[in-house]
Amino acid sequence: LPTTWRPGPPLGCSAGNRMMQSPPITQEITVEEMERYKQATAEMCANLQVCGFDSLLFHFGHSIPVAQFLSPLTDRRTDQYGGSTENRCRYLVEILDACREATRGRMTFEVRMSATEFAEGGIDLEEGIRIASILQDHCDIIQASCGMITEKYMTWTHPCQHMGYHPNLWLAEAFKKSGKIHKPVTAVGGLESLQAAEDAIAEGKCDFFAVARQLIADPETIKKAIDGRADDVVPCIKCMRCHDSTVYGHHFQCSVNPTAGLENSIAHLVQPVERVKK
């Protein structure tokens, strides 16, 4: 939640929550401040629509501040926004509805959420399915991520080399098999290959597979696939250099794509190869 509107501690769903990996420092946001944030978000969506965007991803997962409303571990409010699953979903539903109205229903909304936080007292898979079943009526796609951005639980949020490929696919599959989710479900995290995504979709485990790091490793991944050159795709090795390089204040870096983060500054130095790949 924004911290620039007022001095003092950052605002959170409840007092004493962590902001990502910070100490427990948040101050409980008031209903009036929640309304301001909701309207600002709706205005932002309308502006993005004017700029030409036709789809938006709402990040309601990983225990980032706004996502903390969903979890019984971090939502300790005693008003209409705390307690039951429905109450904990209420504010995010209001945000989605306000954004839908601001964009006149002409944008696709995808909601990213933690299907489970893996934390004791937090969202488990059963609760994640209940939350998704509520949010789905206010968006178009549900993305089944997991974990929390804290030292103990972010391993699943950003799966790295030692976890194997697409370790969180089972969560999207659980959503699909629950019989309670009627909107398309996106899987995310550590994709092995485009063929693996095709197989997961064909087997009914998910409807989409979201990628981010793969497009850093090879920005032409999708184009190569369309052109029938999937074997030429440079795979992401899940080393987390892209994540760590920015966290520690370096320019954006990738272990398998040396041009990542430097595209504009070194474009004039990259010359066509003299001999093309056979």
What are these regions (language model features)?
Residues 1-278:
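Flavin-dependent oxidoreductase catalytic cores
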